[in-house]
């Protein structure tokens, strides 16, 4: 297949490109390199130094024998984007080209506005290009389990669900309750894709993925092939953050009660799942939802795994308790359905309790580099801004 990967420079985009190219697919990628800039904006960087785009392509050719085409540009620039879609006429478009950090979207109103404009315009441009070039192109969009929030019902793996409202039964979109501006943009992505899919019969896979952890995939065989690894309070996911904190001797930053529970998936298993979804597309005109996770844990339980792994490697690891900067349930029910990926042959290769030890081992050689960013790990970005809170007497 010919596959266009939007956001190829990112944590998932790069290893997915390597996997697809290694499997014989023609891979074209686009990235505006915004995550590199935004990470620097908050005083951070990737734990692993990242080569420049053309060097990444050269290293992939050198070590894996694959050819990847990498364009630096912004897909919200529609003339630029449509030209590439028209030139290559891909079988599938992987849409990772969005601002992906919940805390970044909550820094202030300007960051919220940027996140909404960038994420929604990019999705609408993908839809427009597919409609104008070839409506049969499979759109694979990265969503998030965070679209649903933490409902008291089992989260279905479908776009619609039957419900009774005021005594009347009807089919409704599965209820969403996002917890940040970023997560709301993912909800609106779903709304836009569903709207145009129902108008024009587009073929869509909407992936509801949980937090990703890990440093390795089968194709990351050299340091120069590594994908970016974020660990700060704005860009780093919880497992990544804990592993770096363990190395730097910082108490693990458990927010609030620590009962926040999510579905997690390793980097290797995420790439495996994405590849399966691309190589086994839905029927033409179908809107397919895939809940993409492998294990369900609370953030406090993950801290215990990291503490154990760190101590086995000779580190002194303490679990801290921090005021939660977010507005979220800290103890809740959580039970999402997962049938689509197993039906395609997905079987997780990694388990979080064991993989965190590998992560720490991979990060230890970069301890001196990580020390430079020690000041950006503790939580500072608060969801509720004091200047906007009205005092109720």
Swiss-Prot record:
The active site is at 144, 182 (proton acceptor), 186. NAD(+) binds at residues 31-35, 74-75, 100, 118, 182, 186, 212. It catalyses: sulfite + UDP-alpha-D-glucose + H(+) = UDP-alpha-D-6-sulfoquinovose + H2O. Its cofactor is NAD(+). Its EC number is 3.13.1.1. Changing residue 186 to A: Loss of activity. Changing residue 95 to A: Loss of activity. The keyword NAD applies. GO terms for molecular function: UDPsulfoquinovose synthase activity. This is UDP-sulfoquinovose synthase. It comes from Sulfolobus acidocaldarius (strain ATCC 33909 / DSM 639 / JCM 8929 / NBRC 15157 / NCIMB 11770). The gene is agl3.
